[in-house]
Amino acid sequence: MPKRTLQGVVVSDKQAKTVVVRVDRRFTHPIYKKTIRRSKNYHAHDENNEFKPGDVVWIEESKPISKLKRWTVVRGEQKKTA
């Protein structure tokens, strides 16, 4: 069974080797047919502490690393600085 992969934005990098990633999803309400946005935060393992808040990353599910971490950062794009 393939591992799930999600795309999100790094919200926090204050913990060692961990980033908090906000993943947004959109769906249509079954009755009102209005598009709704929901978001969820995931704690993901970042071995080299290379991602900062605002970076777009892809996370992949993995075996439990700690109490909250079940995702690993696979790849990411650093935020453009002007």
UniProtKB/Swiss-Prot annotation:
GO cellular component, one term: cytosolic small ribosomal subunit
GO molecular-function term, one example from the UniProt record: structural constituent of ribosome
Any Gene Ontology biological process: translation
Sorted UniProt keywords: Ribonucleoprotein, Ribosomal protein, RNA-binding, rRNA-binding
Family: Belongs to the universal ribosomal protein uS17 family.
PANTHER family xrefs: 40S RIBOSOMAL PROTEIN S11 FAMILY MEMBER, SMALL RIBOSOMAL SUBUNIT PROTEIN US17M
Function: One of the primary rRNA binding proteins, it binds specifically to the 5'-end of 16S ribosomal RNA.
Assembly notes: Part of the 30S ribosomal subunit.
Protein name: Small ribosomal subunit protein uS17
Source species of the chain: Rhodopseudomonas palustris (strain BisA53)
